[in-house]
UniProtKB/Swiss-Prot annotation:
It is found in: Cytoplasm. Coiled coil: none annotated. The keyword tRNA processing does not apply. Heterodimer of a large and a small subunit. The keyword Hydrolase does not apply. One of its GO terms (molecular function) is oxidoreductase activity. Soluble hydrogenase catalyzes both production and consumption of hydrogen from suitable artificial electron donors or acceptors. This subunit (50 kDa) is required for hydrogen production with reduced methyl-viologen. One of its GO terms (cellular component) is cytoplasm. Its EC number is 1.12.-.-. It comes from the Bacteria. Signal peptide: none annotated. This is Soluble hydrogenase 50 kDa subunit.
Length: 14
């Protein structure tokens, strides 16, 4: 799908 896991980005950016 064309969906982005922002949750992972937020956690990773932490």
């Amino acid at each position: 799908x064309e969906e982005f896991d922002y949750d992972l980005v937020i956690i990773g950016a932490g």
